Every structure is written in C-alpha cells, then in structure tokens.
Amino acid sequence: MAPFKKLKLLLWKNFVLKKRKTLVTVLETLMPVLFSAIVLYLRLNSMPRNKANTNYPAVDVSLLPVYFHNYPLKSKFQLVYIPSKSETLKAVTEVVEQTFAVDFEVLGFPSVSLFENYIIKDPKSFYVLVGIVFHHDFNSSNEPLPLVVKYDLRFSYVQRNSISPPRHLFFQEDIEGWCTAFLYPPNLSQAPREFSYADGGHPGYNKEGFLAIQHAVDKAIMLHHAPKAALDMFKNLQVSVQRFPSGSHIQDPFLVILQNEFPLLLMLSFICVELIITNSILLEKERKQKEYMYLMGLENWLHWVAWFITFFLSALVTVSGMTVLFCTKMNGVAVFRNSNTTLIFIFLMCFAIATIFFAFMMSTFFQRAHVGTVIGGIVFFFTYLPYMYITFSYHQRTYSQKILSCLFSNVAMAMGVRFISLFEAEGTGIQWRNMGSVWGDFSFTQVLVMLLLDSFLYCLVAFLVESLFPRKIGMPKSWYIFAKCPLWRKKSFPVIPPLLVIGDPEKTSKGDFLQDEPAGHINAIEIQHLYKVFYTGRSKCIAVKDLSMNLYKGQITVLLGHNGAGKTTVCSVLTGLIPPSKGHAYIHGCEISKDMVRIRKNVGWCPQHDILFDNFTVTDHLYFYGQLKGLSHQDCHEKIEEMLHTLGLEDKRNSRSKFLSGGIKRKLAIGIALIAGSKVLILDEPTSGMDSSSRRAIWDLLQQQKGDRTVLLTTHFMDEADLLGDRIAILAKGELQCCGTPSFLKQKYGAGYYMTIIKTPLCDTEKLAKVIYHHIPNAILESRIGEEMIFTLPKKAMPRFEALFADLEQRQTELGISTFGASVTTMEEVFIRVCKLADPSTNVLTEKRPSLRHLPRNHRVPVDRIKCLHSRIFSLSSDQPIRLNTGFSLLCQQFYAMLLKKVAFSRRNWMLVLSVQILLPLVIIMLSLSFFNFKLRKLDNVPLELTLQTYGQTIVPFFIAENSRLDPQLSDNFVKMLVAAGQVPLRIQGSVENFLLKKAKEAPEDFDKLYVVAASFEDVNDHTTVKALFNNQAYHSPSLALALVDNVLFKLLSGANASITTTNYPQPQTAMELSETILYQGPKGHYLVVNFLFGIAFLSSSFSILTVGEKSIKSKNLQFLSGVSMAAFWLSALLWDLISFLVPTLLLVLVFFWYKEEAFAHPQSIPAVVLIMMLYGWAIIPLVYTVSFSFKTPGSGCVKLVAMLTFLSISPVVLVTVTSEKDLGYTELSDTLDHIFLIFPGHCLGMAFSNLYYNFEIKKFCNAKNLSDIDCNDVLEGYVVQKNIYAWESLGIGKYLTALAILGPVYITLLFLTEANAFCALKARLSGFFCKQKLRMLLNVTGAEDEDVLEEAENIKYHLDTLIKKSPLVVKELSKVYKEKVPLLAVNKVSFVVKEKECFGLLGLNGAGKTSIFNMLTREQPITSGDAFVKGFNIRTDMAKVQQWIGYCPEFDALLNFMTGREMLVMHARIRGIPECHIKTCVDMILENLLMCVYADKLVKTYSDGNKRVLSTAIALLGEPTVILLDEPSTGMDPVARRLVWDAVGRVRESGKTIVITSHSMEECEALCTRLAIMVQGQFKCLGSPQHLKSRFGSGYSLQAKVRRKWQQQMLEEFKAFVDLTFPGSSLEDEHQSMVQYYLPGQNLSWAKVFGIMEQAKKDYVLEDYSISQLSLEDIFLSFTRPVPDTKENIQQGQAALDSSLSPSNSRPISSPPSSPPSSPPSSPPSRPPSRPSQPPSRPPSRHPSSPSQPPSRPPSRHPSSPSQPPSEPVLL
C-alpha cells in the first residue's frame, strides 16, 4: 500500500476517533479559546485613555528637597568623604555641607571597604545621607584636586523619600532601587513613565537629594579650582532640571497586563492541548494498539506524521479562533491593537506546532497513559519557569543565555509576547517591517526561528528515543551505528548467561513425549532455543525457557498450558510485541529480531486482550486493518461483507466496540486477524468469552481458512484443542513438556476409559459407588465436583463395561442418576496429567482435595475439609456459628478496612504519591523561589557612570542665546564637548520644549533612544537660567542632563581639559533595607501564587486516581455490594487524603523556612499557612471525589481534572488581581468577582496566600518607613493593612477561610447525593414522565412463553408473600429497558425463585440479558420495572439491608491491582463484619481450599486471568452470604483451577446457600446447577432442572467419533455409511474434518448396546477415539438459540431492529426468536429436541443439512466436567 494511502487511512482513523470523542475534542479546541476570552475580558475592562500635551515645571537643584527639612531624625545627617587623609576633600565636603540649610555632620573614612563595613554593620549608618568617594590617589593631605575629577555618589540602597504608593502590588512596573543595572525600564511603554511627576519620579534622583548633592559637589569642585570666577558666575546663575514635555498620547494600562499575564495565560491554555495529545498517543501505546498497527503493516514514521497532521489541523482551528479574538476590535479596542494579524497568527501557530512536538517527545518516555500525561504536563509547566528568570533581568542576560532559554518553547513564546507588547507600547505593534528589529540583542524574528528550532529538536528527541531505546512494548530498532558499541549490544540481551544454558539435561527425558516432525509439510515457523526473561527490580521471571518447535503450513498448532505457563509470551515474541531475551525464531525464513517489517506483512494476530478502538465500529475496524494490510478499496468492502457474514456480525456492523460484549469483541479480533489473507495466524485464546454457538462457528471458520495458512492457537478449551489441533504442544513453567498429534498425546498419557455420572439431588453416592465397584473392582473415583462424579475404568476391564452400563441404565432412577456417559482418554485428562508431571506440587495439593483424591475401598469421603465454605465456616471451635459485627462496630470495622485500602494504595504507588502529591508542588515553589532569589542577587545595584556615552550616540538639542553673558564662546565649547563625547549636538532657535514635542510626534519609535537630554541657556537681564532637560523614559537622564551643564560650566571656568565624571554607586544593602522591598516583592508574590496553584492542581487531581480506578473496574460497586457504608467508604478516603495533604503542607512550611520567605515562615504566619492548606484540602478533596463520577479512566480523569482545576484556580485569581489595580478603575468589579469566585476552593487558596503575602510585606514596608497605620493606609491608596490577618476586609484571609470551611460540608453533601444516585433518580423521574407510555408499550410486547416459565411466573404472582418468606431470592417480572434514542429491551418480565441449596443457572447467547439481570440484582443498573427480593427485602427500597446477604463475582474482575489476594480477602471480610479475631483463620482456610496460598501474598496485578477469577469467586463466597451471584466465574481458567472452583461452589450450595450462576459452559451448568433457564432476547424460553429439560426436549444418544487423520479420507465415508446402516434414523449433526457427531434415536436402543457396537467399530474403522452420551444440555441450548442481535453491547447504540417493537403495526414479538419452540408445548415430551430450520451461516457446506425431522445441530460433545474437553468426551447434563 502506498504511503500516501496509508497516511490518508490514518488521518481518517484519527479524525473519526476525535469526532466521536466529542468532549475531549471540544476541550482541546476550546480551552485555549477560553483563556483567550479571559485576556479579551481584561482588555475590554482596561480601556486606553487619551492624554494631551503636558509641559513640566523646572526643578531647582540648588537646594535639598523639602523632605530633608522635616525628616524625623534623632541625630544629624552625615556627609561622608573618602579618602579621609585628604584635607582637600574635607574642605570640598564642608563646602557642600554649607550649601544647604540642613545641619550635617561631616565624616571621613580612609577606604571604601571600611565605609561599606560601617554601612552594613553600624546602626548609625542610617544617618549617612551620601558617601562621596573620589577616584584619586592623594600623596599628601594638601594635594589639590586634578582638573579631571571622578567621584562616586553613594546613596542608600533603598530610597528614603521616594515613598511612592505601591500601586502595582502584583505587577512589576519599575525596578527596585536605583536601577543602575538598567538604562530603560524593562517594560518600556509608549506612555510617559511616571506621568504625574515633574521631577521624574522613580528612581528618585530629585527626591533623594541626588541632584542637589551632585550639583553641590560639582560647584564645590569649581570653587576649588577657580574660587573667584566661580563665585562671580554663580551669583547670577540659576541651574535647574526640567523634564521633557509629554506629547499627546494614549495611556493604556492593559499593556502591563499584556506583558505580565498574557504569557502565563497562553501557556496554561496550551497545557490542556499538550495533555490531550500526550494522553491520546500513550493510550494507543498502553493498549498495544500502536504496535498492533505496526504488526499489520504500518510504518512508524507514518504513525507520527498522521498524528502531527491531525493535531496541526486542530491547532489551526484553535489558533484561528484565538487570532480573531486577539485582533478583532470590540468597542474600538483589541488585545493587539496595532500588530499585524498575519504575524500574530504565525506566532501562535509556531507555538502550537512546538507544543505538539513537545507532547510527541514526552510520549516516547512513558508506557502508561496517566503517568506520562501527568509528568508531561508538569514538565511543560516547568519549561515556563526560566522565563521568570529572563524577564526581570532581561538586559542583564547575555545573548547566549536568551538563546539557550528559548530552547524551551514556553520561554520562546513568552519572549515573543514580550516583543509584541513592547511594540504595542510604542504604538506600532509588531509588523513585517519591524519584526527583525533588535531590542537589546534579540528580535521577534529570532523568536519565531527558535520556536521552529524547538519543534525540530523535540521531533529529533522523539525519533531517537522511539527508535533506539528498548521499550517494554515493541521491538527496539537496531541501528548499525549503535550496534558497534559493546555497551549497546550488552543492553540488547539483558539476560544472565547461566539462565540461558542450552541443552537442559531434563529435555532428554522429555524426548519420548515429542513426536517426530511430520514429513511432507512446509516448515513455516521455526523456533530455536527461545528464552524470555522478565525483570522486576532485582527479581527475575523466566517466562519461556529453551523453547524449540516447528509450525507447519496448512496445520493448526495448538499451544496449551496453565495460567502463566508462557503461551501469551510466545505469541508476543513471534508477533514482535516484545523482543526475545535469547534464541531465534524464523517466520517464512525471516528472523524476528531483524526482519520484523517483512514478517508483519504476512502475519495476522488475535491477541489475548482485545486491542480495539473504543469508538470504532465493527465495520470501521475491518475497513481500517484491511486497508492497512493492502486491500484495495473495492476489495476491502467485499471482504468486509464476507467477514461480517462469516462471523455473524451483520447486525453489529455499526456498533462501537466499547458497547460490544466480550464474545463479539473476540469475533471482531479474529476477523481483523483473518482479513487480507494473512499467511501466518497467531490466535491467543480467540474463543474466550464466546457462547457455544459462536465458538463452533469460529471452529468452522478456522478449519476452512487453514488451507494455505500457518496457524498458532492458544486456548483453555480442551475440546477446541482436540478438534482444531493438527499438533498440540503443552507448556508448563515456560518449558515445552510434550508436542504431537492429539492421538499421540492420548496414547502417551492415556489411563483407560472415563465414565462421567451426573447425579440428581436424591442420589445415594455410596450406593452408586458400590454398584460400580461390584462390576469393576479396580474402578477409581477420579473426581467428585458438585453433581458430577468421574470414574476411571481400566482398559483390561472392558469386557465388563457392557454389563455395568446395562445395570446403570436399568437402575438409573433408583440410583439417582441424571445422565451418564463414557469416553476414552480426553485432552483434558492429558493436560492435567502433564501439569502434574511438570509440577509435582500441583499433584500434592490436589491430593488434599477430597473430590480429586482416589476414593478408598470403603467409599468413605472425609468431611473435615469441607467446612470452610459452608455455614459453619466460622465455627472454629464449636458447631455454633459466630455472630457478625453490626451497628457501630461494623461501621468502625469497615472504616478501618477502607482506610487500610487507601494506605495500601499510597504505599504501593509511592512513586505517584511522592512525585505528584509531595514533590510536585514543593518543586514548583522551590524553583519559583530560586528564580526570584537568584534574580534578587543578580540585580544588586551596580556602579553606573553618568555620562552620555552610556546611552550610546544620541542627539543633544540645545539653545544658547547669541553672545551669552556667560561666555560668547559658550556654544562652541558646548559643541566641542559633545562631539568629543561621541554625541550629535543640535543647536536650535526658539523653545527647546516645542522642538522636542515636534520630534516626538514625527518619530515616536526612535525618539526615546535618540533624545535623552537637552540644554537651554537663557539670559534674562543680568541673570542666566540654565535648564538641564531630560527624557524621563531613561532612568538616569536627570543626572546626565545636570552633569552635562555642570561640565560645560566647569570648562568655562577651568579650560577645555577640565571635566567632572559622576558615578552613581549605591551603598550596600543594610538589614533594615532588606525589609523595604515591597515594590519589588509584590510581583514575586503574585507569580509565586500562580505557580503554586498549578502544582496544587496536580496534587488535587491525584486524589481522583483511586476513586476513578475503583469505579472503572467496578471494584467500588463490589465493595458497596459487600456491605460497606457510604460514610465508611468516603470519610475514610477523606481522612487519609487529608493526612496525605498534611505532609506537603508541613514540608511547604519547611521550604519557606529554607528560603527565608518571611511572609509565610514568620511565626505568626505559619498557623495561617497550615490552616489555609488544610481547609483547602477539606474543600477540594470532596469536590474531586464528586467530579470523579464523570470520568471513565484514571488517566483521562486526571487530565481533565488538571485542566479544570487549573482553569478554575488561576483564572479567577488573575481576574480579581488584575481588576483590583487602581489605575484600571474597576475595583468594584474586582470585589464582585471575588465574592462570586468564593465557590471555587482554588480561588480561595490563591487569594488567601496572596493577601497573607502582601499584608505581611506592606507591614514591613510601613514599619521600615516609620509610618503610622493611618499614614501607611494613605500611602497605599486603598489597601488597608490588617493587624489581624484573619480579618474579613481587604488583605485579610478571613472570608476565604470561612468559604473553604463551608465548602467542605457542601461538597461532601453533594458527594453523598451523587453516590446515592439522587440526581439520576430525579432525572429519571423527570424523563420518565415523558417516555413512560413508550416504555409501557415496549414492556407489553411479549412473545410466546413456555409452560414451565408461565407456571413459575403465575406461582410467584399468586404466592409472592409466602415465597418471599421461604425463599432467599425471588424475582418478579424483572425488566430492563435502556433508554437511548431507540429504547432497548434487554430483560423482559423475567420471574424465577431460587430456594436454599439451589444453584440456578442463567444460560444464553452473548447479550441475551444475563448480565443485565445481575446488574439489576446488584443495583449497578436501575430496575425499569418489576421487583426482586433477597431474604424478604426488596432491593429497590432496602438495598442497604440486602447487601449483607449477597456475594457477587462480576463478569469482569473487580480487583484492586495494588493489593495482594490476601489483603483483598481480609478487606472484604472486614466489610462483611467478620470479627477481627476470626478473619485470619477464615481467609487462610479459603486460600487453602482454593489452592491460592502460593500466590496469596503476591500483588493482584501479577495474577493471571484465571487466578483473578479464582480470587473473585473467593470474595463472593466470603462472609456467609445467603445469595451468591456468579457471573461466568470460570472464564479464562485452566482445567485444574476450574475444577477447584466448581468443587468449592458445589460444597457451598450443599451447605444451604442459594447460588445464581451464568456461564457459557454447558458442562459447568450440568455439574453445578439444580435448576436453570435458557434466555433468548431477554426472555426465558425454558426453565427447570437439567433432567426435566432433557426429558421434555430430547431423548436418545449423542455419538461422537474421530477418525485418525492418516486415514481420514479413506475411512470417514465408510464409517458414516456404517452408522447409517447400524442405527436407522440417525442423523449427522456436525462434521469437522475427521470428527463426526451423530444423533441416535433412543427407541429400542440401549446405551450398553451402543457401547458394544462402537468398541468393535473402533477397530474396524481406525477410530482415534469416540464418546457416547445421553442427549446433552448443550443440544437443548442450541435448539433454543441461534445467532441473534446482541442486546447488551448495543445499550448505547440502539438497534433499528427494536424500532418495530415500538410500532403498533408490528405484531412480531420482539423476544421471540425464529428458532424458538412452539408457544404451546406438546402434551408429551418429544422424542428428540426441536431442530432449527436452518444452520448458522458459519456451518461448512460439507455437512448434512438438517431437516425438520432431525435433531438440532450439536457441537462435538465434551467432558462434562469442563468446557475444555475433547470431542470424544460425552456432554452430560
């Protein structure tokens, strides 16, 4: 198939699945749009404002600001000069001191280090106003200053007088301190900086006295060099600074939000996309669907390309919507008002592509969906954190640091948003013409390139990890480059050599059991010394050991073995699912480790567990895999129709696989394996879970298809193996025990003949045994299970067989025999003997079982070992049963059991608990604090030389009057000075302010960079005014402008060589000043809280993993059915989760201590932090429990919860925080939103932490400034500092704590109502009002009923009260309708009674309604109509009382994988109320009786399917339940385990219990059931004991014979002719190659006579084996059933066929099958069962057609003790 066609097919698959997963698709598309809507909302609530031209007044610098005159000091300000050895400097400093009216103390320090030490350590350093440090080495104390003077002004680290209100508590608008590390603000805006401050505002050059001191020092220097001239100059000279005028502009407060919040919101919006992508890819990997597609011919690169195109197109839609929201103007504004729409789209699309590839990369590191999804989301968030390090120190970061940071796509995205916001602030927006403009050393173009580079790198990592590293699933790729590396080769074979020694000495002893290879057959599969070893930590498990065997074309090779023998491992190795540890396997000459791509083109695989897409229909699956295997479009449709017909799935063609029953899924899996003509078929238990009719259809299909194929089949059905297997191989503990044809194995392991007897309840076992031993003394009782007894009859006693059979037939009623039959050695017996020989411990264990031991000669059966499962199971020291706990004692015991379950989950999933619940929130906080603290250290104020060269080349406009009174050459000197400094002087005429306004309007983009300072020298009469004009957009322009005019004045006085260079070098930070960082710490608190909320979202969602997991596997339902109370179940979970929540809470406090985060680590704050966290846990955990009801799998639930909690936590906090900004003017809206969002625990948590942080920091700020409470609140402009942090008002946390405390009980109540189905019941009442009439019509449609069924219903109807009192279980007219678009009738007025010591069997095809009955009896599904009573209690109204009387084994194991088998039993024992002192004994006895002791203490996840079924059955039998419901209890068990379970169930029934069982095994029902009913389309078609049904519907015998295949063609026809001649009236019922099945009429024909005839025929016609039995229950079952529409799996789909049941015009009864018996049964039992008018479509054409006079078509009969018996075995019922 061409790659393009495969790609098209994969895209079709992906989009069909996305279309049918509506919620996930909507979430993926809308989550980014929702976050975009938040940004749009903020935009619409922060409208831009127009500002007119503004001129600012000049500021006199000759005097200190007024603040210093009123500053509250206990001592004088200090002026410090350095070095102190110079008297010259002291004189200069004293001149400075005399300049001002403030009283100063002049101090000198010898060195800078001593000065800094004084500042840091001495409390008196607070009074140091400034330190003046001259850069000159004075050789003597009187040495004068040089003409070139350089000095530092060292003001305090934190400004003293710039107490500007912390207007932006949550966003950083300006850098803290003197900002000497920056020339411009990091977030430079088009709007004027500090618009309302004439002196420029922050960093406070005027208010701090810097300009006054600078000018005073400059003036003192001038006086030092030219005392007289300087005095004369300054007499008529006034120097001032003046801010550049502001032109008309738009003041847009949203730009602050855009730059600070938009990157975070954009990242959070795409994190949901990343989670969904990762989860989608990993689900395919976890379910092995990905490897299955590879096996069917898919190339790896196509898989990734298809996924990329799928998510790319989804992202295209999402990004288009986001672009529209961002760029479309609403109310005259848009999020990006000025930017190019195309560029915004390209930018977002590049980020979306990078996110897709990031998800691809993360998916390659994991095998489990929910683990990979959670960790992928965490890592995605972590990659955003470096941006916080970059953004606040952008100008300090090197180009390499920025490039490396942009290797994280989230950082690159945030950098891109930064550029967009900067260009938006300039008023131009990002455009094609300016996208390459370098801002600092980076540009928007580089951001786009880095996003594309990130995508490539992520893709490369994904490719390398996918290709080169070994995985648990799939073959690791071998690249020759890495193959040269010895280390790589070593890793390829991680098996210890001693384990792989070839040539096991024991294999020589097994050679007798390995048949010679057949001659003349093509060897298609060759396995040579194959090993597979699995490692779990330090332990290892050899799954396959030295396996060598061949498989041949045209043959079916059957692989048998006990659960865990290694069958599935062999299949997985051959299909390439897992690599072999050592050895080789060749398929059609290709080695599996090297040529898997070629092999897969010819292999069809049906895995043990269905690998189906939940939302694909049957037709979709066949079409997809057919096309993938290379079928053309036309051929594919033809093959699909053919396959649907062959498999009997026509009516299921449009049903989604998730709604199909297990049997139908197995059919579909077989169809997928067969489609497109695969030459090699590997079928792993293909018929598991199928009903008898379906299984026979598959047998026919496989025999038809095997001609040119090689088939490897595994199974637990021995009859299937005997019938289909050309060769049979048996594995035990991974080793091959025997291999050969069925006849070869029977010959090697045979022990004679087997007689199977099915007893009636009145049978006298000892009397019956005496009769048998009388005829054959050497007979051995092989097993006794329930109603079944199996005797081994030695071959040498064969002459006595006829007399024995005649005697039993004549005395059948007297001896209490229901049916009996005999056969030669069966495959089941072969299997059991092989297992015993391979594992002697099995033999020892089974010898302990009374039903499996040889009966002693006196026929006495010991009874001391059969007490543990009946009513005296708890009577450990006496015959009196103990009392179960009740009331409060039971509640406490259940609470304890549920608490231990939670503890076990945490202990066994410690990695999950440690990573998600503990480390994740702590690591996020630690990383955030590390970034902020690192930033604080790196942003310490550094020395900055205040010269124009610092800002590069600028234009300096100046105005100097002609013939200035200062100096006629002033203009020339000024120009020369600027040129020498590398600047561009520009002399203008007229007003400098007007010139600047004009230039700012002409070129707004370049103005702030080109025009930093200006000067004006004006003469007014005899007075000169010098104005130093500065551009306030530059932090240090005021001092630069002053230095410029001071320097030109100095040059006028002292010559052209004179110059003064001033450096701003802040003092080191004192301990006191550390507390004055609120302006800087505010943004830190905001981002800290946002990051923390994200981590808490993951922590909170993790509490859903167990609850969703229990719900998905129905373990929770089983626990409730066992009797656990709602309070015990949920409150125990809440308690443990709160304890778990306390651990990260306390560790969080330690983290705050470690990082010295006083706001949270202060002694007064610690109780508040703990209280906030615990109340949040109290509220959020019940909410998570409640929401978890909506999820089906833990992985998807965790993903959706993270998305939901992130959105509902961060979005409200951001909205309330942003709208609370004073500049926006929406404080009332903020308060309203704050109160609305109190219903969300995440919002309460975030706001409580925010207020706790800001309140503490503001209090520190005000205390440092010595401000009173009133003054502090005035400065804060509306923020009220709370002395009591628990206050309700602004910056208090009281209302949030109160809300959290109230939300806890509210959500708990909501949880209990949800658990009690209160909302479902309400919905049902409301919807039932409208559809009641339709349902009544549907339920009134009934088919013809059998007389026994009618009699049972009438008896219940008229004697209901009596039956309720006497019978443990009474079901009256129980009905179930699934209310879909087309109402589906699953159960139609079923009535039956089950008495004590009865085992009632429900038989029927897949979907007949059996499980629906169980679901109603256990209240897993609501009852549509009817009633059911258990011990007199109605399950509709008294379910809480009913629970204590019911034991339940569900169809699919509801076991908790993280617990051991023993722990599961102990937990359910506590739930049942067994006293603690008896639990251990009780559990030990059950484990011993079911042979579970070996693996009782192993985790359930290590159990095989069969062992899980044993454990599920044990749970159902535990605790003395009166009514036990077993839904297919023995499915998937090997024969040994199956017999043990039958034995246990039989003895439980004998003890007086009531059992209801469903099964697809007729032998199981024959062995266990005292009464049974056959269901067809929701109705009972017959009801009664097995013997009663056989008496009514059939008589005669069933003959099965198998001709040796060597003489198959020659002798088969002769034998058929012999039967027709010898038994007149016989009919051929079934034929499968060498096996035939006949119906023999019972008139004048004795069983013993038939046996005698067949013994002779065995010799004459070379029969391999044969069996004779009375007519079986399976014959009757098949007569009532045929392939019919499956009701159960179409619950969600609704079948059109049922439409007719709603139509009054349609008179055909919905539940009456075409093959149902007549509505009026005959007055006397018919001589034979009713036949079907036609055979199933899967029957081979070679079979004789059935005629109306013939008996029903019957399958090969089997050993009655097991559904896995060979065809030679009688089926006795």
From Swiss-Prot:
GO molecular function terms noted in the UniProt entry: ABC-type transporter activity; ATP binding; ATP hydrolysis activity; ATPase-coupled transmembrane transporter activity; lipid transporter activity
Chain residues that bind ATP: 561-568, 1404-1411
Pfam families registered for this protein in UniProt: ABC2_membrane_3, ABC_tran, R1_ABCA1
Cited PROSITE patterns: ABC_TRANSPORTER_2 (PS50893)
Keywords from the UniProt entry: ATP-binding, Cytoplasm, Endoplasmic reticulum, Glycoprotein, Lipid metabolism, Lipid transport, Membrane, Nucleotide-binding, Repeat, Transmembrane, Transmembrane helix, Transport
Extent of Pro residues compositional bias: 1711-1740, 1763-1773
Name this protein carries in UniProt: ATP-binding cassette sub-family A member 17
Species for this entry: Rattus norvegicus (Rat)
